[in-house]
């Protein structure tokens, strides 16, 4: 065994790789849903304006005012405690997406307000195009660079969210593996500190490396997409 075995004889390296698949796929799936919801909500608010824009932004501000960790734990605790791993996987993606779209919607709404008065958008309205078609066809190309950069920078938060839930026993459960679950198992095993402290270091190092890499990649993409950069 490359990294040894845990207290039940399972290969730590194999579980680390399997946990990467679970943790990273939750991040990618969650951020994809978040970007779609945030773009549509922000685009519609910027397009229609008025009362719809006011109501949508007050709801967004309400969500953003609540500490995300407490809201995450509250939403998870309100659900049935005995989901299997597949059901838990879906629920974590839904919960993280439901909490993450508000920030994206607020930024997209601000960008859409200026686009709504553009001549080509007014021409599309005069030709009878539907609001959704206008938002996708004319707004999306102008905000796509922000969505890509925002998604890259937000993936670490989703990985950390899954790790936090699993570490607290509210996320992925045995016999599946995730980085947060591996941290929880290492903490609860009294033999770890005496015989195999690397059981705790390996999932922690994987989370740290993933968060660092995505943050660096996001900074690079943000600099590349900055129109003010020389």
Feature-to-residue mapping (PLM):
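Alpha-helical transmembrane segments of integral membrane proteins
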Residues: 5-230
């Amino acid at each position: 065994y490359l990294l040894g075995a845990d207290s039940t004889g399972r290969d730590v390296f194999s579980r680390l790789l399997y946990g990467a698949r679970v943790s990273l796929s939750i991040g990618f799936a969650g951020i994809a849903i978040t970007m779609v919801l945030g773009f549509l909500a922000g685009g519609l608010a910027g397009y229609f304006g008025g009362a719809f824009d006011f109501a949508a932004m007050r709801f967004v501000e309400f969500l953003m005012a609540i500490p995300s960790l407490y809201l995450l734990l509250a939403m998870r605790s309100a659900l049935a405690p005995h989901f299997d791993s597949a059901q838990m996987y879906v629920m974590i993606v839904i919960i993280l997406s439901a909490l993450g779209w508000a920030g994206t919607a607020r930024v997209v709404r601000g960008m859409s307000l200026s686009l709504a008065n553009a001549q080509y958008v007014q021409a599309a309205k005069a030709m009878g195009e539907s609001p959704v078609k206008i938002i996708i066809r004319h707004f999306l190309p102008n905000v796509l660079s922000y969505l890509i950069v925002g998604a890259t920078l937000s993936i670490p938060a989703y990985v950390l969210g899954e790790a936090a839930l699993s570490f607290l026993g509210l996320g992925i459960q045995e016999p599946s593996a995730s980085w947060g679950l591996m941290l929880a198992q290492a903490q609860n095993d009294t033999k770890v500190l005496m015989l195999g402290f690397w059981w705790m270091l390996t999932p922690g190092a994987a989370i740290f490396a993933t968060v660092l890499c995505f943050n660096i990649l996001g900074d690079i993409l943000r600099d590349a997409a900055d129109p003010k950069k020389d």
